[in-house]
Structures are given as C-alpha cells and as structure tokens.
Amino acid sequence: MVASVQEDSKASYIYLYKKDGSALDIYVKSLLSGDGYPVDVSLSPGGTQWITSFMYLEQGMIKNKIVFYNFGLGKNDPKRVVGIFLPEDLSDAMAGRVRFMDESHAVAFTDKGLQFLSTRVETSPESTSQILLDENIRRISYKNQYAGVITDNGSGADPYCLRIYKPDGSTVFETTFSYQYTGFDIEGDLVMLYNDNSCCIYNMAGTRKFSGTFDFTVNKVLAGRFPGTILIMGNQKMEEIRLK
C-alpha cells in the first residue's frame, strides 16, 4: 500500500491506496490549527499500522509529536489513534523521518539522534530506546532490521563516525572513517558508502569488506544476485563484485 498526504487551507489528509492505484476507504484528517502538519508518515509491512510525525505551534514555538494509528485495533478512537509521543517524550527533538522497520518496531530520526519505538502491544506503543548524539548528523539510512547514521567524529583523526543499530536500539557496530562519501545505503547485511567513482563496503561486524575505484560514474551500489556479491551501477555499465 501507498500513503498520500494532501491538504487544503484548514486540514491535511492522509489517504491509503492499493498498488493498483485504487483508494482504500481509510484516511486520517488532521486540523492544521490543532493537530499540526504531517512531516512524514510510514506504514507497517502489514499495512494496518502507521506512524506519523507532526509539527505544530504551541505558544509561538514549533513542537513535534509522533502519533501511532492502528486500523485493525484502534476502533475505540474514531481517529484510530493508539499512541502519542509528545515533546517531553522526545527530549524536545524534531523527527523529520519516521519508519516502520518491521511489524512491531519503528524508528524516528530526529535532529538529536534516534528514537526506537515498539508496537509489540499494538494498543500501547512504547519507546524502547533513545539515542542522543552530540555530533552533527550528516546522513541517515534504514533497511528492514537496521537503522544507521553518519555523524561528525568528535575525536580522533577520522572526520566521520558510522553507527548501525538494531530495531530495539541496541548497537550493531560503530566505526570511524575518512572515506569521502556521497551515498550511504544499507543492503541486507552490508553497509554501502560510495561516491561518483568509488565505494567502500562494511559488513555488520564493522569490518571493511571492500574498497575500490571504478573507470565509470557510480550511481548506486546494491546487493548482488548471489550472497557475498555487490552490484556497482553506472549510467551505461554495471559491474558485479564478489566480496572476500
């Protein structure tokens, strides 16, 4: 399913659509003057839950809240709301991106770090971990069972720090690096850093598995067709590499 955010002068509306483009009889209406403006929305893999980050004004200050909806169990509330995380629950952070990682875990990427949330009890979402980062957050990435951030490195010679987390907020690995990346993706159990002529690959043990340059412009780096391989995608060329 696909979610679409639409708005008029007084309210915003989040609609759900099937893959064939037909609309479902499910939507959420939010008054801009009260509920705020939806910054980002994410559906659970099963399509019955969604999480939305709202920005709103309170006494002239911009605030942020995260709202969980459940269209299978939230029938007691006409808006299908099952949980709300207010500014005090988020350390007054602003969540610009929210994502369901699986059916019972979600992550909010904020200007202060990451907030991991659980819907194991679907009628009562809870915060499982909050990662507050002092360093400037430069890039984020997420894919199923992993969420990652690249920040400035506060100490040491390397300018950047890469951190990867599980859905419950526990750390998978953390490492510093100096590679000058423009792209950052998580593919399976690999972390892909790349720029227009090279790439650098880490596994989930934090080990660098590959670093190399190419004679063509790199647009994207993907997991390969077979385990232990990656695909280097260019405009008119594709190269498959087997990792050692």
Regions found by a protein language model. Give the residues of each.
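Short beta-strand elements that form the blades of beta-propeller/WD-repeat-like
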Residues: 1-7, 14, 47-60, 97-110, ...
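Aromatic-enriched hydrophobic runs in primary sequence
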Residues: 4-5, 17, 128, 136-141, ...
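A broadly tuned "polar low-complexity/structure-edge" signature
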Residues: 6, 17-18, 35, 44, ...
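Long amphipathic alpha-helical scaffold regions
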Residues: 9-12, 25-26, 216-234
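Envelope-exposed proteins and targeting segments
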Residues: 12-13, 22, 37-39, 104-105
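Surface-exposed loop/turn elements that mediate protein-protein interactions on large endomembrane-trafficking
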Residues: 13-32, 63-88, 110-133, 156-176, ...
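Repeated scaffold domains used in trafficking and secretory/extracellular systems
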Residues: 33-44, 83-103, 131-145, 176-189, ...
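Long, internal scaffold/assembly segments composed of regular secondary structure
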Residues: 40-43, 47-55, 62-66, 70-71
